[in-house]
Amino acid sequence: MVEAFCATWKLTESQNFDEYMKALGVGFATRQVGNVTKPTVIISQEGDRVVIRTQSTFKNTEISFHLGEEFDETTADDRNCKSVVSLDGDKLVHVQKWDGKETNFVREIKDGKMIMTLTFGDVVAVRHYEKA
């Protein structure tokens, strides 16, 4: 099922992302860059691992993991998290935990586009990606 996500994706639309970053505690300058950056996300399967590469003019990140297994992740805004990515039906669910806090991203494919819903507490952001 991960195969449905394996592609190169370009951000096309973003809703409430500034409020989401603010809730996470991301500083003003980093939020300004985050709001205008249009990252490319490359999702691939390499052997039994899933790899998610995020490339932008701001910062490049890469995570490699086994589905359902916890791993250490350093985010683009330099949070050190314990993360787990798993499949829930046709959704790819990514949970990050740090300092007693938790956020999650749910990626799903709708009409050939990848929709990513980011939730932290009661703040929800939605980012839309199209195949590059």
From Swiss-Prot:
Keywords on record: Acetylation, Cytoplasm, Lipid-binding, Transport
Cell division among keywords: no
Protein location: Cytoplasm
Location, primary (coarse class): cytoplasm
GO molecular function: fatty acid binding
Domain remarks: Forms a beta-barrel structure that accommodates hydrophobic ligands in its interior.
Family under the similarity heading: Belongs to the calycin superfamily. Fatty-acid binding protein (FABP) family.
Record protein name field: Fatty acid-binding protein, brain
Organism: Bos taurus
Lineage of origin: Eukaryota, Metazoa, Chordata, Craniata, Vertebrata
Name of encoding gene: FABP7
